[in-house]
């Protein structure tokens, strides 16, 4: 089965991360569950810095309702990586992020995944429309269609 290409040029924003000692598992590479932590860090850092998300006192919060990851190459401590981020789908109350983990400066991803947030009212836990500042932040990195990428 041929893997789809996940190239650096297909991602619009990058979050630098340094792997940590405890990221490695018994097999000497970053454990698969740790990639989800990297995704969470990249998405939430972006939303806080660019969209004004207030994770401590804001009226809305983002709940992860779906996530997945495909692994192509191992990474290990100590490495500097960059998590590429683009927005795959922007709905009324949900966002699908498309993410990829790259070794610093490399063009081909070591892993790629998706992460879906539904934004909810902090008190009621009911879905709400994405506030305009967050929506604008997401629109900045909405991914082009595969056909547009080939142009």
Predicted regions and their residues:
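A short acidic/small-residue loop/turn micro-motif
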Residues: 117-119, 135-136
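Catalytic strand-loop segment that frames the active site of acyl-thioester-processing enzymes
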Residues: 1-49
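Conserved small/polar residues in nucleotide/adenosyl-binding loops
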Residues: 141-146, 150
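Hydrophobic beta-strand-centered segment that forms part of the acyl-chain substrate-binding groove
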Residues: 46-95, 110-113
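Short, acidic, Ser/Thr-enriched surface-loop or helix-capping motifs
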Residues: 25, 103-104, 121-122
């Amino acid at each position: 089965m041929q893997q789809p290409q996940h190239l650096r040029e297909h991602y619009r924003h990058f979050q630098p991360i340094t792997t940590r000692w405890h990221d490695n598992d018994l097999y000497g590479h970053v454990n698969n569950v740790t990639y989800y932590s990297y995704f969470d860090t990249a998405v939430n850092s972006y939303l806080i810095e660019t969209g004004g998300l207030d994770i401590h006192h804001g009226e809305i919060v983002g709940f992860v309702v779906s996530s997945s990851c495909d692994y192509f190459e191992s990474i290990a401590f100590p490495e500097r990586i960059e998590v590429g981020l683009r927005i795959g789908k922007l709905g009324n109350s949900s966002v699908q992020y498309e993410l990829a983990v790259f070794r610093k400066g490399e063009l081909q991803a070591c892993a790629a995944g998706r992460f879906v947030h539904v934004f909810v009212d902090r008190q009621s836990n009911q879905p709400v429309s994405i506030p305009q500042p967050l929506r604008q932040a997401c629109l900045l990195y909405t991914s082009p269609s595969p056909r547009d990428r080939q142009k």
